[in-house]
A protein has these predicted regions:
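Zn2+-dependent peptidoglycan hydrolase active-site motif and core
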Residues: 16-58, 85-91
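Acidic, glycine-rich catalytic/binding loops that coordinate metals and/or anionic ligands
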Residues: 43-47, 58-72, 90-105
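Short glycine/threonine/proline-enriched tight-turn/helix- or strand-capping micro-motif at secondary-structure
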Residues: 1-18, 39-40, 93
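Short hydrophobic beta/alpha edge segments that flank linear recognition/processing sites
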Residues: 6, 35-38, 68-80
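Residue-level structural signal for beta-strand termini and adjacent loop
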Residues: 28, 56, 78-79, 103
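Disulfide-stabilized cysteine-rich extracellular repeat microdomains
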Residues: 11, 58-61, 81
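Secondary-structure boundary/capping motif
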Residues: 8-10, 86, 97-99
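Short, well-structured beta-strand-loop connectors
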Residues: 13-24, 61-76
Length: 105
C-alpha cells in the first residue's frame, strides 16, 4: 500500500498540500474512487512533484484549474476500494510514488 491514510469523518474538507494545477479530477477505475491529482511543477532540487488525494465523497476542483496551497479541493469519503471514511494521500516525485513522510514537518 503506497501512500498515507488519514482517518477522518465523511465530509471533512480536504486541502491542497501545495499550489499547482489540477491534472486529474474525477472517478478512478483503479480503486481510488473520486480523486484529484495536483501537479506542483519542477522544484529547486530539479525533480517534479505532484500530490494525489483519493476516496473523496466529492471533488471541488476541475481538471486544468489552478489551486493554491490550503485551498479546499474535496471532501473525505469512502469511494472506490475503501472500507471506511479516510483520505488516501500520495506524493509523487518524477511520476513515481515516494514516502510522503519525507515531506511532513
Amino acid at each position: 500500500h503506497a501512500g498515507t491514510d488519514f482517518a477522518a469523518a465523511g465530509g471533512t474538507p480536504i486541502y491542497a498540500a501545495a499550489s499547482g494545477y489540477v491534472q486529474v479530477a474525477g472517478w478512478s477505475t483503479g480503486g481510488y474512487g473520486n480523486y484529484v491529482i495536483i501537479y506542483h511543477g519542477k522544484m529547486s532540487d530539479g525533480n517534479t512533484y505532484s500530490t494525489l488525494y483519493a476516496h473523496m465523497s466529492r471533488t471541488l476542483v476541475r481538471k486544468g484549474e489552478t489551486v493554491r496551497i490550503g485551498q479546499r479541493i474535496g471532501k473525505v469519503g469512502s469511494t472506490g476500494m475503501s472500507t471506511g471514511n479516510h483520505l488516501h494521500f500520495e506524493v509523487r516525485e518524477n511520476g513515481e510514488r515516494v514516502d510522503a513522510m519525507r515531506f511532513y514537518s
